[in-house]
Amino acid sequence: MSKTILRLPQVMTECGLARSTVYLRIKQGLLTKPIPLGPRSVGWPQSEIEAINAARIAERSEMELKQLVKTLQANRQGGIRV
């Protein structure tokens, strides 16, 4: 699992989406919510973007994509290991 954080321009490039479409997909539950990096900056785990893109390439249904997004966001909670 990659620990790289992608900023919005990178996510737009990786997904082939415009800025407004990225945020629309988040609202629709088709893309994970960004994580805060600072007071005015956010990013997305690269592994999540890769998983979503792989599902899109595999032509998963909208319902399957929404379930994947829910699973990815739920998995964030268990990501801290010391």
Segment roles from a protein language model:
Residues 1-16, 21, 40-42, 46-82:
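Basic Lys/Arg-rich amphipathic helical interaction modules
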Residues 28-35:
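Short, solvent-exposed alpha-helical "recognition" segments
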